[in-house]
Every structure is written in C-alpha cells, then in structure tokens.
Amino acid sequence: METTNSNYFGTEKISRILLKIAPPVMLAQLIQALYNIVDSLFVGKYSESGLTALSIIYPLQLLMIAIAVGTGVGINTAMAHYLGVHDEKKANEYGGIGTPLTLALWVLFAAVCFFFMPAYARMSTDSPEVIKDVIVYGRIVCVFSIGLFTESIWTKILQANEDMKTPMIAQIAGALVNIALDPLFIFGLFGLPKLGIAGAAIATVVGQIVAALIVMKKGFRKSPPLSVYPRDICFIYKLGIPNILMQSAYTFYILGLNLILATFSDQAVTALGLYYKWQSFFFIPLGALQTCIVPVISYNYASGRMDRCKKTLSTSLVGGMGLMFIGTLVFNLIPGQMLRVFTSDPQVIAIGTVGFHFVGISFIPMVTSLIFPVFFQAVGAAVKSSLLTVVRTVVLFVPLGYLFSRLGLNYFWFTFPVTEVITTLVGVFFYRRFMAQQK
C-alpha cells in the first residue's frame, strides 16, 4: 500500500502540484478519448445503424460511470479529508468499504439495465435495426460492467494516496486492449466470428476488466467491520452525491436532447452523438483538472488553508480556459472534417457542421460551469454543488433545447452557449456567497 506524503498538498506550490498529478490523468484520459473515437470509427464503418445505437446508449454509459465514479469520488474525498488531519487508519477504513459497495452497485445496475433495455431502445427510435443494435450493445456493456465499477473505485483510492501512475497505466492498457480487439471482433478478422455491434461491446468490457485487474493489487483495501458500514457509507455519499448528480444529470439531459432531436431525424441524433465523441477528446484538460483539484482542495480545506483552496480554483480556471480555447478554434475551423472521420452521410455532416460551430463557442464558459461544482464538492458545500448541476442540466439544458428547437433545428444549437453562460453567472454568485461566509 502506498501512503501519502501528508505535507505535499499543504505546502507545495499549487501550480507544481497540478503539473505533477494532472499529466498522468490527462494521458490516461487521452487514451480513453482515442478509444471512444476509434470505437465509433469502427462501428461507423460497419453500419450507420450501429453508430446511431452508440449515440442512444451513450446516456446509459454516462449513468453507469456517474454511479461508479461518483461513489469513488466520495471515497476519495473522505480519504483525502482524513489524510489531511493525519488519520491514515480512518482513511483506509473508507477505502476498505469501496470494493463491497461497488460490487453491490454493479449487480443492481446490471439487473435493471438488462430488463429495461428493450423499452429504452423503443423509446429512443422507431428504426427496427437501430432498436436491435441498442439492445445487443447495451445489454453487454451494462451486464458485464464489473470492470468499470471496480476500476473506478480502486482508481479513486489510489488517487487519494497521490498514486496517479498506476491508474494511468491501467486505463491506457484497458483502452489499448479495447482498440486492438475492436476490429477483430467487429469484422471477424483472423478467423474469428464476425460479431458486429456485439463485438464492439465485448471489446469494451474486456478492456475495462483488464484495467480493473491492474489497479486491484494496490487499490484493494481490507474491509472494515460491518458495524461502521452504515455511518461511513452515509458520509461517502454525502461527499459523492454532488458528483453523482452532476454526472447522472448528463445522462438525463443528453437523453432529453436525443429525444428532442429524434423529432427531426435519426441523423440529428447521430450528429449530437458525434459531438460528444469529439468532446471527450477536447475536454481532457478539463476532466483532468476536475479529478486532480478535489483531493488538493479537500486536504487544504480540512487543514484550514482557504488561501490555497482559492489558489487551486483560480489556477484551474485560468489553465482550463486557455486550453479549451484550442477546442473552440478546432470546432469552428474544421467541423466538416471531424464529422467525416466517422460518417459519409451528407445529412449528418450538414447538421453537425452547424451544431459544432455553436457548441464550440460554449467551451470557454463551460470551464467555469463545470469547475465550480467540483470546488463546492471538495469543500463540503454539497447543496451548492448539487444546485449548480441541477440548474445547468435540468433547469436550463433540456427546457432551452426544447424552446430553441421549436424555432428550427439550427436554432436548437443555441442551447449550449446560452446554458453555459447562465450557469457561469450562477456559479460566480454561489462562490461569492460561500467566500463571504468564510470570513
């Protein structure tokens, strides 16, 4: 077991901390993003219906990740808090609850998804071919998601102990296995059976299991006595629910946007799905910052170093905006080329080109609207974190998407920049009130 350097988060220069712990996370997320792109590329070459099915399944995959990663973030934050007050025994107690808790979550999620999948597919599209692909792909990636659940928990345990290298290696290995298996299983190369969309799903879960096995040795902790489970689980979810809400809200707003776009065409749904594939690539810096600032802020807040909490927030915002400006340029300069990587459907390309222009504009304000909830989560302001997430995803995204869509498909894409600007303003208001209460 690796133990944390208890003074590092509290004494080292903030920019140096982030430069040390963020690159491994970024590299791992880069490989994950490349996997998402390559996975969709192979499926798109196999069939257009399969590509649409991936767009429809995407919200469910986000929900699965939200439950797993959000629980892991709760454990990570609890461990970082107790490490901040030099109580390593208590920190490891929370780590020990992680494995039994995540296995229970996996069983529950797998059972619900297996029985719910046909209804979800029929709700999302009228195409029989797409419905079939959704059911096949969705059932495999949900029922066999044990690798995703356990890897998420063990990764967060290691990150709480400043071990960013092992999770990076695990995620890279899992993604590379996935990428290697995709063409073999989808197209039936080297004498293997041609499995199509099912092959893509199998490659996904195999890669997840490989990643989980790599982090298991260092991430697994001995379970504490059952008597502490109720109290500790309540504390884990007090800290983790904001992240779960934030991530699962993505599920419901993307599902809502998919249903709105489905009133226009399946091609519109596919265009939105391709945006999220590319978004995962360009949001690597932001995702890494979200992951890395939580233990830093949580540690310093527990130690009474509010000045370092503020510095961590400002450093992540400035760095995130600078990096996301590159994404804004790319989405506005070469949207057609990005779409043609996956599809030759002229309708998808035409719809997506317009959409990419408007969505790219939203990247800069999106930095603040996504970093603020993480900050509030790390300092234990769960209500503010949750409210900000609800405002963005429930109050704004889907209602605005519906209203703009009534004006026409092109107007629908205004939803993204308008939502991010309003959320940023609300986040600034919450932050100022929080800081006033600290004086």
Language-model features, listed with the residues they occupy:
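Small-residue-rich hydrophobic transmembrane alpha-helices
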Residues: 51-115, 148-162, 166-167, 271-329, ...
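Short alpha-helical transmembrane segments in multi-pass integral membrane proteins
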Residues: 1-22, 79-146, 192-241, 297-362, ...
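Transmembrane helical elements of multi-pass membrane transporters/channels
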Residues: 20-39, 140, 151, 174, ...
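Short runs within selected transmembrane alpha-helices of multi-pass transporters and secretion channels
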Residues: 72, 141-159, 167-175, 200-213, ...
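N-terminal transmembrane alpha-helices
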Residues: 9-41, 45-46, 62-74, 78, ...
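Helix-terminus/linker motif at the lipid-water interface of multi-pass membrane proteins
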Residues: 30, 34-52, 121-128, 184-195, ...
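Structural signal for membrane-spanning alpha-helices in multi-pass inner-membrane proteins
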Residues: 113, 156, 182, 186, ...
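Hydrophobic alpha-helical transmembrane segments in multi-pass integral membrane proteins
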Residues: 248-250, 396-402
